[in-house]
Amino acid sequence: MTQFRTVLLTSGLILALCAGAAQAQSTGKPSLTLQMPALPDPVRVVLKPATTALLVLDYVDPICSSQPKCKGAMLPAVTPFMAGVRKAGVIVAYGTRERTMSNWLPEVAPAPGDIKIVNTTQDRFYNTDLDKELKAKGITTIIMVGWKVSGSVAYTSVGATVRDYTVVIPVDTTAASTDYETVIGFYQILNQGNSNLTNEPLKPKSPTLSRTDMITFQ
C-alpha cells in the first residue's frame, strides 16, 4: 500500500514536529517521537456466495454525496462490484440512520428483498436485528463497504467479529475525510480484539483487507 506508507511517513513527520514543538515550548526537553507501522497490502480472497453477505453503510445523501472521496472514488468502485455481488447471488444488507434510510444513492440503492437496518450508533449490530437476520440466512462472512472507515466501518467490523463473523473490507470502497484518518481507520480495524496484524486472508472471525478487483466468488 504505497499510498498508506507515504501517508504514514508524512503524518508521522508532522506529528513528530508538532509534538516536538509543543513539548519544547512547555518543558524545553527533547521530545519522544513514534511512527506507526506500515499497513499490509490488500489480499486476494475467494468467497462462497451462500454464506456471504454484503453490508452497505451510509452510501446516502448527504453523507456520501458531500464527501469528495466517497462520491468521487468509493462510489465508482463499489457500483460495479455490487453488480457482481448481486449476480453471484450474495445477500445484500443496508444500514443507516432512520432520517437517511430513503436517501440511498441511486447507483447502490436497495433492491426488493434486501435487508435494511436502522441504526442509532455507528455499530450496525448494536441494538438491531442485523445479527439475527444474517444468521437466519446462514451468513458467516461479511463484506463491508461504506462511509467511513474510521467510524461506522471500524465499529461495525468489531461488532461483527465479536459475533463470530469473518469480515472482508475492500479498501477502495471505504475511506475518511483525510488520508491520515483513513490510515488510522484501517490500522484500528486490523488491531481490534480479533486482530489480524499480518492481514492473513480470511482469518476466521477477524477482519481482512482486500480490494474489489481481488474478491471473487466460487
Residue ranges with predicted function:
Residues 25-53, 80, 99-218:
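Active-site-adjacent betaalpha module
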Residues 27-33, 64-72:
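Acidic/histidine-rich helix-loop elements
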Residues 53-66:
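Acidic/histidine-rich, surface-exposed loop or edge segments in extracytoplasmic proteins
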Residues 50, 67-85, 90-94:
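A short alpha/beta connector and helix-capping loop motif
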